[in-house]
Structures are given as structure tokens and as C-alpha cells.
Amino acid sequence: MDIQAAEISAILKQQIKDFGAEAQVSEIGQVLSVGDGIARVYGLDNVEAGEMVEFPGGVRGMALNLEEDNVGVVIFGSDRNIKEGDTVKRTGAIVDIPVGKGLLGRVVDPLGNPLDGKGPIEGVERRRVDVKAPGIIPRKSVHEPMQTGLKAIDALIPIGRGQRELIIGDRQTGKTAIAIDAILNQKPLNQGDDENQKLYCIYVAIGQKRSTVAQIAKTLEENGALEYTIIVAATASDPAPLQFLAPFAGCTLGEYFRDNAMHGLVVYDDLSKQAVAYRQMSLLLRRPPGREAYPGDVFYLHSRLLERAAKLNDENGNGSLTALPIIETQANDVSAYIPTNVISITDGQIFLETDLFYQGVRPAVNVGLSVSRVGSSAQIKAMKQVAGKIKGELAQYREMAAFAQFGSDLDAATQRLLNRGARLTELLKQGQFSPLKVEEQVVVIYAGVNGYLDKLPVADVGRYEQDLLRNIRSSHPGILDAIRSEKQISADTEAKLKSAVENFSKAFA
């Protein structure tokens, strides 16, 4: 075998020419200490705030404290297998999650990993979890209604698309029930063909029991609402960093719809638990505590989250993101730190009371303390026409009821006012998972404010309402169609409605 020098040199030249110097360079650090879901890492000198880092075994973390000689990292997962001296790798990416319509009908964790066993998530793009809220110029005032299907809310405390309305109350007062009803009520809109009317929902469960989240998913599925809903779950057994991240992940999912000329609704259930998780992380990272041991930036935590809910103007696609944050109070104390913070950030609050709940007023909305700072611009004209009176009458009723306890000899006008108020309060009661269409609410409230209930015993009001709606649906569907299409009660419609309600009231017994 003879060796050909020319051939060998040609091969060597080719190999030298083809030599690739694309070595993967990733900056690494070392774990100094680890415990309670926090790792102190030495050596990641160029790491960015909020950047994802990777520990051995694929566990991820997020760099939060950038100090002179070390980096404080919160760990998204178990820290059991991480030990001192382990290498930590920078990923170069700020925390992001998959977003898009491919997530509808799914249950995911705050990093976008599926939890429902329905396979991988298809057809999505990735977005950063913590982004800046839209400025003042791209926004528009809130003017389209976001119907919850609950008479007490749609008539008295209307919510508009792009609004942030806080649901606040003690434990077991029906806060989640209101939010779930609002999601269920979007079913007719989402089954229609009008993309401008559809409202995609995101339910964020923070620090709740897994059984509760499973129950909510089952309720949504049984009512046909899961197909337009995404559930983001960071349950009680998940580490604090995931509970802290969950609302931001849910908001990012909603922003996809807002920025693509669609409409989103995001429910944060509840932000008290997010604040507790953030407090835990901050104290373990040795950040100085403030009032109630919360860190100084806990206000900014919630404000930067809730400011991302917005109604965008025509140049930006006219999309919207509505937020329903939930806060749990202790013994009706609305003046605690987190409740006052969130009340001051949101555009109104729905205040639920234990006493009302146990008196059988459900939803247990305290109409006196609840407000919507968007007001009637978030109502259709028909609802404004009937709901204007009910607000005034209920306010007078509450005032009179307080005095009426002391005196038995009341004049006829006061007695009439008390009777009407008691019946209107009864009229606003509603069962769970039974939202009403807005035109049906208008008919019912019309009957209430025009005195058709005044002669009835209070106990019969619920039956009257159901029978009236049944009668109108079967015998006078034109009235409901007119209110739905015209969005107001014209003189012609009012005449028909008046005669229909009068005839029904005479026959009702």
C-alpha cells in the first residue's frame, strides 16, 4: 500500500478548513447554600433579574436577588436533590410561557406544563410572564358590558370589558361562585359566530386545594364552559415561587387575547395567597419586612399585575382584558394591608358579607359598600332604564330599615318603601350556576321597580320571577328579542312589556 502525500495533505487541509469552533459556552455558578426553596449561588456574574437558571436534574429557578457576591434564586420545584457545590447554568431567557388558543380547555401550571393528562399543548407561541402594562395612549375608556348573569351585579355594580373589579369577603361567602358564574355566563357569546363578542376566560387558582381545582374544572366541563377557559393552577402543595408566578402567567395568557383584537377575562383566586407566597420568598431572600411583615414592594406586586388589564383603542385592535381579583378578608376587616392596597388599585369592589350569606341573601353582596367606578357606561341602555330606580330604592330601604327597628308606628309612605325594599332584596337573590341573560334580567327588574311585587308575600317573589320568565319566553318572545337587539326599552316595547307583566300578575296566584 503506497502512501500518497498529496492526497493526505489535501484531506488534512480539508479537515482543518471544516473545523468548527462552535463550542456551547454557558455561564455557570455554584450553589453556596440551599433550603426552603431558596438557593444562594456564586459565580453567575452576568445573570439578569428574573432570568431562568437551571439546576442539575432539570429543576429550574428564577434569579431574584442580584447581590455583590452571590445571587438569590427561587426554585420552581423541589429543592431536595439540590446540594451545596452543585453547578447552576444560565439559560439566557427571562421566564416565559406558551400562549395561544391551543391552551383553551386545558389545565396548566404557571410555567405552561399541562396538568390534565391530555397530552402536549399544540399551536402556541411563547411570551414573557412579566411585561410592562400598556401606557395611557393605547387605552380607551371602558364602555362594553361584561355580563356576569347575576342580577345583583349586572344591575347595581356593572362590570365593563377592560375593568378590574375586586371580589372581596371572608372565607365561605361565595367569592369563587360569583367568578365561576361570570365564566359560565359567557357560554352563549362563545357559541356564537361574532369574534368581537366572544370572551375567553382564564381561571387562576393560587394556593388552593387540588380537590377544589378539580371540582371547578369538572363544573366548567359539565356546563360546557371549559372549551373557552384556561385553568392555571398553583396549588397549596406547590412551592411559593409557583404560587407567586401563577397570576402573572394567567395575565400573560389573557394578554394574548387582548393584543390580538379579542377579549379576555382573568380571575385571580386569590391574591391574598399570592401576597403570602411573595412574603415568604422575600423574607427567605432576606429582604427587609414592612407592615404585617410583607415586603415594601407588595403594593407594586399587585399594581403591576392589575394594570395589565385594559381596554385598548381602535388603532390597537380594540381588544380588552378584564380582571376579577379575589381577596379573602379576616372577620370583615377591609382595612388590613392587602385589602386596602387592592381596593385602591381596582376600579371598584363587590363586597360579600357572612351575615347576608347566612340570612339566605345569595349572592351575599352588600350593595351599600360595593361600587363600580366605571358605572352605567358598562351597561346596555335597557338595563340603565330599569336599574336607575332600583339603586335609589334600595339605598332608601337600607336607611329606613335601620330606623324602623326602633319605632312600630310608621307612616304609610315609609311602610310602602320598606315593603318594596324587602321584595327587591328578595328579587336580587339567585341560585348558583344559574346565570340569567341580560334581557331576562331587565324584564324581572322592570316588574320589581314598577310595583308588581308589592302585593305579593315575600316568600312568593322567587316563584313569581320564574313563572314570569317562563311566561315571557313562551308567550312573548318578541319582547326579549327586541330588548336584545335594540339594547334599550323603546316606547313600543315598554307598552308590550307592561301589558304582558300586568296580565301575568293578575293571573299569578
Curated annotation (Swiss-Prot):
Main location: membrane
Mode of membrane association: Peripheral membrane protein
One GO CC term, this protein: plasma membrane
Its EC number(s): 7.1.2.2
Enzyme superclass (EC): translocase
Binding site for ATP: 169-176
Amino-acid biosynthesis keyword on record: no
Site note Required for activity, residues: 370
Pfam families cross-referenced by the UniProt entry: ATP-synt_ab, ATP-synt_ab_C, ATP-synt_ab_N
Superkingdom of origin: Bacteria
Keyword Transferase: no
Gene Ontology molecular function, alphabetical: ADP binding; ATP binding; proton-transporting ATP synthase activity, rotational mechanism
Catalytic activity: ATP + H2O + 4 H(+)(in) = ADP + phosphate + 5 H(+)(out)
InterPro entries: ATP_synth_asu-like_sf, ATP_synth_asu_C, ATP_synth_asu_C_sf, ATP_synth_F1_a_nt-bd_dom, ATP_synth_F1_asu, ATPase_a/bsu_AS, ATPase_F1/V1/A1_a/bsu_N, ATPase_F1/V1/A1_a/bsu_N_sf
Location of the protein in the cell: Cell inner membrane
Keywords: ATP synthesis, ATP-binding, Cell inner membrane, Cell membrane, CF(1), Hydrogen ion transport, Ion transport, Membrane, Nucleotide-binding, Translocase, Transport
Family: Belongs to the ATPase alpha/beta chains family.
Subunit structure: F-type ATPases have 2 components, CF(1) - the catalytic core - and CF(0) - the membrane proton channel. CF(1) has five subunits: alpha(3), beta(3), gamma(1), delta(1), epsilon(1). CF(0) has three main subunits: a(1), b(2) and c(9-12). The alpha and beta chains form an alternating ring which encloses part of the gamma chain. CF(1) is attached to CF(0) by a central stalk formed by the gamma and epsilon chains, while a peripheral stalk is formed by the delta and b chains.
Protein name stated in the entry: ATP synthase subunit alpha
Gene: atpA
